[in-house]
C-alpha cells in the first residue's frame, strides 16, 4: 500500500511537470528507482540518464549544508547556439550551469538528458531517491 502511494505521488508529479514543461502527449510509467546514501566526501560525477524522458530526485534526508544538485547545459553539442552575445543578466535560458535551491522533502524533476550531479558532500547521511520515467504502454 505505501509503495503504491509513493508511486502514485511520483507519477502525478511527473504528469504535472510535463504539463508545465514539454507537454508531451504521453502517460508515464516508472522504469526504475534507487536509493542513494551519501557519506561525507561522496560525489556524483556529472551524468545523464538514457532511455527515459524525465528523471526525478526526492530528497529524503537532506540537511542544510548537504551538496545540492548541479545542472549543466551541454555546450559541446551541435545544437548549441553558434552566435552568442553578452548577456545583461543570467536567466534559466542562458546559464551554462545552475544549482537549484532545495530542502528535505523536495522532489526535483528534470529532463533525463540534462547533465547533473553534485560535488563533494560535506556531511554524512545525505539520502535521496532517483526515479526515471518512460512512456507508458
How should each PLM-predicted stretch be described?
Residues 38-109:
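Catalytic core of non-heme Fe(II) oxygenases with the double-stranded beta-helix
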Residues 20-24, 42-46, 57-58, 116-119:
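Short helix-to-loop capping/linker segments positioned immediately adjacent to catalytic or ligand/cofactor-binding
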Residues 90-137:
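Catalytic core of Fe(II)/2-oxoglutarate
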Residues 28-36:
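A short glycine-rich, His/Asp/Glu-containing loop-to-beta-strand
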Residues 29, 63-65, 125:
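Short loop/turn segments at connectors of secondary-structure elements within structured domains
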Residues 27, 48-52, 123-125:
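A generic structural micro-feature
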Amino acid at each position: 500500500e505505501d509503495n503504491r502511494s509513493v508511486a502514485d505521488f511520483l507519477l502525478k508529479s511527473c504528469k504535472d511537470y510535463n504539463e508545465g514543461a514539454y507537454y508531451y502527449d504521453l502517460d508515464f510509467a516508472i522504469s526504475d528507482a534507487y536509493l542513494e546514501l551519501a557519506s561525507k566526501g561522496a560525489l556524483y560525477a556529472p551524468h545523464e540518464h538514457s532511455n527515459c524522458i524525465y528523471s526525478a530526485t526526492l530528497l529524503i534526508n537532506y540537511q542544510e549544508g548537504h551538496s545540492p544538485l548541479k545542472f549543466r547545459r551541454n555546450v559541446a553539442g551541435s545544437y548549441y547556439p553558434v552566435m552568442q552575445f553578452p548577456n545583461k543578466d543570467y536567466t534559466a535560458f542562458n546559464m551554462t550551469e545552475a544549482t537549484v535551491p532545495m530542502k528535505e522533502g523536495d522532489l526535483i524533476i528534470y529532463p533525463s538528458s540534462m547533465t547533473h550531479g553534485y560535488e563533494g558532500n560535506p556531511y554524512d547521511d545525505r539520502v535521496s531517491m532517483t526515479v526515471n520515467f518512460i512512456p507508458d504502454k
